[in-house]
């Protein structure tokens, strides 16, 4: 279980690093556009990502475990 968490974290880091590595200009543009969004929109977006991550986690946990 402990190694699974580290593997998941490593995958997140790889996926998060692909944007700035492959498309730095587009990544900067996206980040600057996000700073102009209202806080409630950012909270909804973040909450949606958390919910999606939890759903995928439980789906994979039932399938694999």
From Swiss-Prot:
It is found in: Cell membrane. The chain crosses the membrane at residues 4-24, 45-65. The keyword Cell membrane applies. Pfam families: DUF2065. Its main location: membrane. The keyword Transmembrane applies. This is Uncharacterized protein YjeT. It comes from Escherichia coli (strain K12).
